[in-house]
Amino acid sequence: MDLVNQYEDSSSRSLKASSLRDSPRLSQSQFHSLISRPYDRNDEDSPANSYLLFTTEGRLQQATLDLLSGSDIQFRRETRLDIALVKNLPIALIFLPAADIPTFVGEGRVDLGITGRDQVAEHDAQLPEGEVSGVEEIMDLGFGGCKLQVQVPQKGDIVEAKQLIGKNVVTSFTALTQAFFSRLEGVEFGQKLSTKIKYVGGSVEAACALGVADGIVDLVESGETMKAAGLKAIDTVVESTAVLVKSRSTRNSLVDLITSRISGVITAQRYVLCQYNIPRSGLSVASQITPGKRAPTITALEEEGWVAVSSMVEKKKIATVMDELLKVGASDILVLNIANSRTG
């Protein structure tokens, strides 16, 4: 499905309908001119001051759009265009598959990108020996979790990865797969392997059923697709999640601004604000239950011997925290959502 259609159907449509209505538009020729010209951030003729924020299409798409919305990055994307100019910042957004992003970030063509850690690892594994990656991971975004796993037919005799040595393995991650089997075979990375690694861009899970492969190396999220294809995982190559990456060559001051905004949104998604009253005598124990990110906020109540406590708590732990607070004498426990934040 086209990105703009998914965007219009999402819960983010209110952002598009209001603040995005007057966003500047970029023609197809302007797009090609922008990405092909020598990269100069001081170029006053650039429609985005030559600053590009790179984001993604695919399985990370909707969470990325929500993250940009929460960071007040206002844009409008025209149908069939891979680029959108931001209304309220001198930034251009480029929408491309996650696999392409580390290359553009690493070569310094763009400053920031959102992609999977697996894609960064695949990019880095392709670099010549001794070459330093131009991609720097700066934040785990906490969504898009998956594993790059070695998989084989459920009904077969193979139960561990080393049994695939010398056989056919199909994958979209050829560099990581080659590095993995190089370790299994005990040879230097880049040397000829007895294992035959073949590249397939999509539908990797069908390779075994079609007789093309004895095993595959592919991403697994829930595992449902793997099971439906009659496969089982026997080893893990890389564990992945969505990450914010930047070019090591960037000097753009907006990088820190955007990073701070994204960090604030991620914090707001992960935490809630827990407020409760408790006798001062129980404050020490309660503070250990709700230590906050730095320390809890404590306010004396008019009722003598009582205090009010406010503390940030991880959302996934809040039910247990509330139970523990009740046990130590807390009352009037409230949990409030955090819309956004800036934390140290």
Residue ranges of model-derived segments:
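Small-molecule-sensing regulatory modules
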Residues: 1-95, 107, 114-147, 156-344
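Extended cationic-aromatic binding surfaces that line active-site or macromolecule-binding grooves
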Residues: 102, 111
